[in-house]
């Protein structure tokens, strides 16, 4: 006979990975066309000059250049200017 009672199995012990959102390229950084600038949920940052908006609100560079973060009133936008 066993002298230890069987241990139960836990139903916890799992966790999902984070969604890896956030700013990927900061102001002043050089980028190439197609580089992801920001991954976000909704338009926290709006696309400015030479920046595209993906289906999941990802902002990406349309041209090679330098990233700038600008704000006009309450709206923050990201632009890329050729260097």
Swiss-Prot record:
Alphabetical list of Gene3D superfamilies matching this protein: 2.40.50.100
Species in which this protein is naturally found: Desulfosudis oleivorans (strain DSM 6200 / JCM 39069 / Hxd3)
Taxonomy of the source species: Bacteria, Pseudomonadati, Thermodesulfobacteriota, Desulfobacteria, Desulfobacterales
Residue pairs linked by disulfide bridges in the UniProt entry: none
NCBIfam families reported in the protein's UniProt record: L27
Official protein name in the record: Large ribosomal subunit protein bL27
Disordered: annotated span: 1-26
UniProt GO molecular function: structural constituent of ribosome
Pfam families xrefs: Ribosomal_L27 (PF01016)
Family statement drawn from the similarity comment of this UniProt entry: Belongs to the bacterial ribosomal protein bL27 family.
Biological processes annotated in GO: translation
Keyword Ribosomal protein carried by entry: yes
